[in-house]
């Protein structure tokens, strides 16, 4: 999912500040570790579209988008609540631009303790 090491609360808060400064709306999504990656077992192929195209890759939204969010501490509080409710799930923060009606960015804020997908840069190989 990410080549970055886990983000600290301070780093997440700075990202939220940037999101809010651009008038975007933060939102949390989560997925069980066996459903987080797109694959044949958890996706629906949509007819004769491109052979590798898979649909139904959506994660579950945690509550509603945070329309009234004013600072990073509010998002951190929701991350903690989501982690407490779903400790073995991946959790990502995404943000939406209401003017363009698109998702602007997304990144992991919680990797489950059972996850084995992250490797330190020294341990990676191509």
From Swiss-Prot:
Protein name listed in UniProt: Ribulose bisphosphate carboxylase small subunit, chloroplastic 1
GO cellular-component term (any): chloroplast
Family: Belongs to the RuBisCO small chain family.
Task performed by this protein: RuBisCO catalyzes two reactions: the carboxylation of D-ribulose 1,5-bisphosphate, the primary event in carbon dioxide fixation, as well as the oxidative fragmentation of the pentose substrate. Both reactions occur simultaneously and in competition at the same active site. Although the small subunit is not catalytic it is essential for maximal activity.
Record key words, sorted: Calvin cycle, Carbon dioxide fixation, Chloroplast, Photorespiration, Photosynthesis, Plastid
GO biological process: photorespiration; reductive pentose-phosphate cycle
Location within or outside the cell: Plastid, Chloroplast
Leftover remarks: The basic functional RuBisCO is composed of a large chain homodimer in a 'head-to-tail' conformation. In form I RuBisCO this homodimer is arranged in a barrel-like tetramer with the small subunits forming a tetrameric 'cap' on each end of the 'barrel'.
Subunit (UniProt): Heterohexadecamer of 8 large and 8 small subunits.
């Amino acid at each position: 999912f990410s080549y970055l090491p886990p983000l600290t609360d301070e780093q997440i808060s700075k990202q939220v500040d940037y999101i809010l400064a651009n008038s975007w709306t933060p939102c949390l999504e989560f997925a069980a570790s066996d459903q987080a990656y797109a694959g044949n077992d958890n996706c629906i192929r949509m007819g004769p579209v491109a052979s590798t195209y898979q649909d139904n890759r959506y994660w579950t939204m945690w509550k509603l988008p945070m329309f009234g969010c004013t600072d990073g501490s509010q998002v951190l509080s929701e991350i903690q609540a989501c982690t407490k409710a779903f400790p073995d799930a991946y959790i990502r923060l995404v943000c939406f631009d209401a003017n363009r009606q698109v998702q602007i960015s997304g990144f992991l804020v919680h990797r489950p303790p059972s996850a084995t997908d992250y490797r330190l840069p020294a341990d990676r190989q191509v």
